[in-house]
Amino acid sequence: MSAPAAEPQAAPSRPTIGVLALQGDVREHLAALRACGAEPVLVRRVGELEAVDGLVLPGGESTAISKLLQVFDLLDPLRARLRDGMPAFGSCAGMILLASEVLDTRPDAQHLSGIDMTVRRNAFGRQVDSFETDLDFAGLDDGPVRAVFIRAPWVERAGDGVQVLATVPDGPSRGRIVAVRQGNVLATSFHPEVTGDLRVHRMFVDIVRAAGDRAGNVHTPDVQPT
């Protein structure tokens, strides 16, 4: 008697992930998310924010993005979605925006308190102090992550519920925290979207999928990725 045929494996869900498109390196994040099997969309309006399963806050200029969040009436709705458990990923300026406390910023700058952490803006110095290094990143296989730091922040305090994923391995900034996660929210000081290494984005897409599976409401578009 032949063995019963194996049940076909269900295709992974294709979540709709927004990229906050007010300022910064939006296009690179869109491409990385698409390559990881997500459906990336631009987010500039409240209605667009409400329709996504997760959100990327890209690198750019944190105080400019902070102002634009207020101009576009996105600040409070975004805080509310984060409180409700929406997954989010912030790189560089996005890390600053996700912090609960920001040092060396403008007194009128706003932040989202998505992660219980204190972040120092421009901690590594000016544009001329930008650099690259290899990082051991917790939860990622296949060797170190090549990290590009451009006027980057670092984390000076990580709260009790915050998982430290990566620190600077050497040099004058050795031991500084540059990647963290708290629940569904992920943040990096560096720009994974510019190196072609998709592992950090895959980690975030997996976070979004898992959150959607628990809630039973992942948006899976009918269109196929291009």
Curated annotation (Swiss-Prot):
Substrates-to-products reaction catalysed: aldehydo-D-ribose 5-phosphate + D-glyceraldehyde 3-phosphate + L-glutamine = pyridoxal 5'-phosphate + L-glutamate + phosphate + 3 H2O + H(+); L-glutamine + H2O = L-glutamate + NH4(+)
Keyword annotations from UniProtKB, A to Z: Glutamine amidotransferase, Hydrolase, Lyase, Pyridoxal phosphate
This protein's GO CC annotations: cytosol; glutaminase complex
UniProt xrefs under Pfam families: SNO (PF01174)
Residues reported in the UniProt entry to bind L-glutamine: G60, E61, S62, R121, I150, R151
Record has Lyase as a keyword: yes
The keyword Hydrolase is annotated on this UniProt entry: yes
EC code(s) of this entry: 4.3.3.6, 3.5.1.2
Listed GO biological process terms: glutamine catabolic process; pyridoxal phosphate biosynthetic process; pyridoxine metabolic process
Function: Catalyzes the hydrolysis of glutamine to glutamate and ammonia as part of the biosynthesis of pyridoxal 5'-phosphate. The resulting ammonia molecule is channeled to the active site of PdxS.
Subunit structure: In the presence of PdxS, forms a dodecamer of heterodimers. Only shows activity in the heterodimer.
Family the UniProt entry places it in: Belongs to the glutaminase PdxT/SNO family.
Protein name: Pyridoxal 5'-phosphate synthase subunit PdxT
The organism of origin for this protein: Nocardia farcinica (strain IFM 10152)
Gene name, Swiss-Prot/TrEMBL: pdxT
